[in-house]
Swiss-Prot record:
BP-aspect Gene Ontology terms: symbiont-mediated suppression of host innate immune response; symbiont-mediated suppression of host JAK-STAT cascade via inhibition of STAT1 activity; symbiont-mediated suppression of host JAK-STAT cascade via inhibition of STAT2 activity; symbiont-mediated suppression of host type I interferon-mediated signaling pathway; viral transcription
Name the record gives this protein: Phosphoprotein
Motif (Nuclear export signal): 49-58
Motif extent (Nuclear localization signal): 212-215
Organism from which the protein derives: Duvenhage virus (DUVV)
Record InterPro entries: PP_M1-like, PP_M1_C
């Protein structure tokens, strides 16, 4: 009888192919679940929305009934208390937010990075609020004390001198505060302590899993492994970049477990050329969002 010899390396490669096939099947099933999310009552992904969102009209009988009641109440109110579109400061702000939302949808359809889009949107919103809703510093220290006029002129004249003295001392305190900066600077010590504790917590959790490899979706519909060591970055630089990911600072302040795979993917997608070549950006965005949602619900 002839004997058939099998090379052990062939067995190992076959087992590796089986493992890759199982992981690919899991990834395909997950993608199928994501594509059928609208059938399960899960919110639809932003990428599936049409470009012209204004054409969408979702009808709800109860909502229309409530709207009719609200309209009737508005007609019954006095017209003097009604704010037109020009007088209401929230109307242009809502228009600005709608424009930012449309811009985000267009950029995500072009395949641009999520965190880059989000950071630009946050900067636009913050700059708009700072320009249109800013409160002068002098109003924070405005003297709201009232002075009642007494019937006796002698008491009024006698109290005028100390009132002037108190007013001058109060103005001196206001000037000293204005010279030293806004009132928020009094909180710098506590803010610095909070920032140091947050950075320490983030650095601690990253250092514990610095060499641990995490799975990421590849462009070839498979997966590949990556860890923090392959970033070739200092721990301080990684922590600085990770703090830009939404929700990480809040979780670190609360002492929660951080989404390390999401953090690694966010930093690597902007600082590692090899990672950018290997990873599938669309699937990476979904994986990172799933990790954030999962850890924030704990």
């Amino acid at each position: 009888m002839s004997k058939i010899f099998i090379n052990p390396s062939d067995i190992r490669s076959g087992l590796a192919d089986l493992e890759m096939a199982e992981e690919t099947v899991e990834l395909v099933n997950r993608n199928m679940e994501d594509s059928q999310a609208h059938l399960q009552g899960v919110p639809i992904d932003v990428e599936t929305l049409p470009e012209d969102i204004q054409r969408l009209h979702i009808t709800d009988p109860q909502a229309s009934l409530r709207q009719d009641m609200v309209d009737e109440q508005k007609h019954q109110e006095d017209e003097d208390f009604y704010l037109t579109g020009r007088e209401n400061p929230l109307s242009p702000f809502q228009t600005h937010l709608d424009a930012i939302g449309l811009r985000i949808v267009r950029k995500m359809k072009t395949g641009e990075g999520f965190f880059k889009i989000w950071s630009q949107a946050v900067e636009d919103i913050v700059s708009y609020v700072a320009l249109n809703f800013s409160i002068p510093v002098n109003k924070l220290f405005e003297d709201k004390s009232t002075q009642t006029v007494t019937e006796k002129s002698q008491q009024a004249s006698a109290s005028s001198a100390p009132n002037r003295h108190e007013k001058s001392s109060q103005n001196a305190r206001v000037n000293s505060k204005d010279a030293s900066g806004p009132a928020a600077l009094d909180w710098t010590a506590s803010n610095e302590a909070d920032d140091e504790s947050v950075e320490a917590e983030i650095a601690h959790q990253i250092a514990e899993s610095f060499s641990k490899k995490y799975k990421f979706p590849s462009r070839s519909s498979g997966i590949f492994l990556w860890n923090f060591e392959q970033l070739k970055m200092n721990l301080d630089e990684i922590v600085r970049e990770v703090k830009e990911i939404p929700g990480v600072i809040k979780m670190a302040k609360d002492g929660m477990k951080l989404p390390l795979r999401c953090m690694l993917g966010g930093v690597a997608s902007t600082h590692s050329r090899r990672f950018q070549i290997l990873v599938n950006p669309e699937k990476l965005g979904k994986v990172m969002q799933e990790d954030l949602d999962k850890y924030l619900t704990y």
